[in-house]
């Protein structure tokens, strides 16, 4: 939050949540990698809306939808729809998206068994 002082009042302005997250992703590469892991975990645990929303923030902060479209061969508008909270990407398209984001963040995913 940012305080703005005028002669008569003090007003608090806030930034939208996604803007705050995007700014932090740009500042902290480790935070971006943690968010990526959170997105994958959310999707695997059945929380697709949460996972897709996180992936969208990562794309907005790190890649851009135009570049993601180039990397995946998918349409930019289609990617926007797929990464919407109500998006429903196919398994193939989701795989292309998470692979491109991982490569852009220099992440090499691995599977561990508990």
Indicate residue ranges for each PLM-predicted region.
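N-terminal flexible/basic segments that precede or flank functional cores
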Residues: 1-54
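Residue-level detection of the helix-turn-helix DNA-binding "recognition helix"
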Residues: 84-85, 102
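DNA major-groove recognition helix of helix-turn-helix/homeodomain DNA-binding modules
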Residues: 92-108
């Amino acid at each position: 939050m940012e305080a703005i002082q005028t002669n008569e009042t003090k007003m608090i302005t806030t930034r939208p949540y996604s803007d705050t997250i995007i700014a932090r992703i740009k500042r902290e590469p480790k935070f971006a990698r943690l968010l990526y892991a959170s997105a994958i975990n959310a999707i695997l645990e059945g929380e697709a809306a949460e996972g897709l929303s996180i992936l969208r923030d990562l794309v907005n902060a790190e890649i851009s939808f135009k570049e993601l479209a180039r990397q995946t061969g998918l349409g930019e508008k289609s990617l926007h729809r797929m990464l919407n909270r109500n998006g429903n990407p196919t398994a193939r398209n989701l795989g292309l998206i998470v692979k491109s984001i991982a490569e852009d963040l220099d992440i090499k995913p691995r599977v561990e068994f508990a």
